[in-house]
Amino acid sequence: MSTSFENKATNRGIITFTISQDEIKPALDQAFNKVKKDLNVPGFRKGHMPRTVFNQKFGEEALYENALNLVLPKAYEAAVAELGLDVVAQPKIDVVSMEKGQDWKLTAEVVTKPEVKLGDYKDLSVEVDASKEVSDEEVDAKVERERNNLAELTVKDGEAAQGDTVVIDFVGSVDGVEFDGGKGDNFSLELGSGQFIPGFEEQLVGSKAGQTVDVNVTFPEDYQAEDLAGKDAKFVTTIHEVKTKEVPALDDELAKDIDEEVETLDELKAKYRKELESAKEIAFDDAVEGAAIELAVANAEIVELPEEMVHDEVHRAMNEFMGNMQRQGISPEMYFQLTGTTEEDLHKQYQADADKRVKTNLVIEAIAAAEGFEATDEEIEKEITDLASEYNMEADQVRGLLSADMLKHDIAMKKAVDVITSSATVK
């Protein structure tokens, strides 16, 4: 193989490479064995035409396209490796010459990874909007949330108040015409929960069981049902019951009902304090890591970020997100219908952060390279074991999904992140 690289612009160039006859001949044999199965030529059983007859009838050139598809990926990868290029997008391949008995000559228009000029990434001083401290109020708030979860609804006489639950029938109409989805029977609605459109729940405060209330509202301009967006509507609402929350007493019995591992309210609060401290510690460390990485990226200079890298990142993120949705049984069509969004909206959402994500990855990779980080066999095995445990998979399944190169890359990236964050201090 002969190879050359011609630089055309920053991070862009053309590879010229050849594919030798030693590679072409077996590829032509494979291509012939593939196509002959479907050949039905008079004088020969289907799939049994000799190669010489095929060449006479169709010409060896008829196999070139299939043969090229077989040999091209390996040849292109070998050319990139020989030239020591770091290619970051799909190449544009063109055939220069494919003459019988001669090496094939091709070109590949490629985009290469941009140069990263690192700035300071160690001993960084960062500011974070996070704290490890847990206040008594935060502990009490957690207890109160659990206490409210054990509250029981009891029917009450008198007017409905904010926080009460009303059991209602309702029929909605616009200009006197009922609309789809605007009707409900025996619906339990907590006043103040924000379940219904703005203004609806407030108009039921002060109502009593047995009353019928005309609730007049205006649908928001951005309402997902476009035929209703911005329109005035009336909901004829009948109140069947008004229920209020009866919360249990704040005592040791409540603590035992919430958590069978404790005996007193003080024990419950102590347990919650430890849980909150642990969660806050993780959140604080994450905040420091994020701030330190962001500063390291800001201190670096990336020479002309190729738009192809950003484009690929957008589609990678979108595909990952939609794949997660489908694993939960939600198709793309269902997701867009439920959220009132479009594929274009999702694309814009990921586009906004793609540039930042690509730059961050490039800088972390550059730090890993500058530090000479590599992964040992022991580290790779530990990573496989950890991933298998995290995703409830067998180790061999992980090995089948992730190549050794991917695992080595991830481990080196983690080491680079650790270098940035372990030396960072908080202002």
UniProtKB/Swiss-Prot annotation:
<dbReference type="Pfam" id="PF05698">
    <property type="entry name" value="Trigger_C"/>
</dbReference>
<dbReference type="Pfam" id="PF00254">
    <property type="entry name" value="FKBP_C"/>
</dbReference>
<comment type="similarity">
    <text>Belongs to the FKBP-type PPIase family. Tig subfamily.</text>
</comment>
<keyword id="KW-0413">Isomerase</keyword>
<dbReference type="GO" id="GO:0051083">
    <property type="term" value="P:'de novo' cotranslational protein folding"/>
</dbReference>
<dbReference type="GO" id="GO:0043022">
    <property type="term" value="F:ribosome binding"/>
</dbReference>
<dbReference type="GO" id="GO:0005737">
    <property type="term" value="C:cytoplasm"/>
</dbReference>
<dbReference type="InterPro" id="IPR037041">
    <property type="entry name" value="Trigger_fac_C_sf"/>
</dbReference>
<dbReference type="GO" id="GO:0061077">
    <property type="term" value="P:chaperone-mediated protein folding"/>
</dbReference>
<dbReference type="InterPro" id="IPR008881">
    <property type="entry name" value="Trigger_fac_ribosome-bd_bac"/>
</dbReference>
<keyword id="KW-0697">Rotamase</keyword>
<dbReference type="GO" id="GO:0015031">
    <property type="term" value="P:protein transport"/>
</dbReference>
<keyword id="KW-0131">Cell cycle</keyword>
<dbReference type="InterPro" id="IPR005215">
    <property type="entry name" value="Trig_fac"/>
</dbReference>
<keyword id="KW-0963">Cytoplasm</keyword>
<comment type="function">
    <text>Involved in protein export. Acts as a chaperone by maintaining the newly synthesized protein in an open conformation. Functions as a peptidyl-prolyl cis-trans isomerase.</text>
</comment>
<protein>
    <recommendedName>
        <fullName>Trigger factor</fullName>
        <ecNumber>5.2.1.8</ecNumber>
    </recommendedName>
</protein>
<dbReference type="GO" id="GO:0044183">
    <property type="term" value="F:protein folding chaperone"/>
</dbReference>
<feature type="domain" description="PPIase FKBP-type">
    <location>
        <begin position="163"/>
        <end position="248"/>
    </location>
</feature>
<dbReference type="InterPro" id="IPR008880">
    <property type="entry name" value="Trigger_fac_C"/>
</dbReference>
<dbReference type="Pfam" id="PF05697">
    <property type="entry name" value="Trigger_N"/>
</dbReference>
<keyword id="KW-0143">Chaperone</keyword>
<dbReference type="GO" id="GO:0003755">
    <property type="term" value="F:peptidyl-prolyl cis-trans isomerase activity"/>
</dbReference>
<dbReference type="InterPro" id="IPR027304">
    <property type="entry name" value="Trigger_fact/SurA_dom_sf"/>
</dbReference>
<dbReference type="InterPro" id="IPR046357">
    <property type="entry name" value="PPIase_dom_sf"/>
</dbReference>
<dbReference type="InterPro" id="IPR036611">
    <property type="entry name" value="Trigger_fac_ribosome-bd_sf"/>
</dbReference>
<dbReference type="GO" id="GO:0043335">
    <property type="term" value="P:protein unfolding"/>
</dbReference>
<dbReference type="GO" id="GO:0051301">
    <property type="term" value="P:cell division"/>
</dbReference>
<dbReference type="InterPro" id="IPR001179">
    <property type="entry name" value="PPIase_FKBP_dom"/>
</dbReference>
<keyword id="KW-0132">Cell division</keyword>
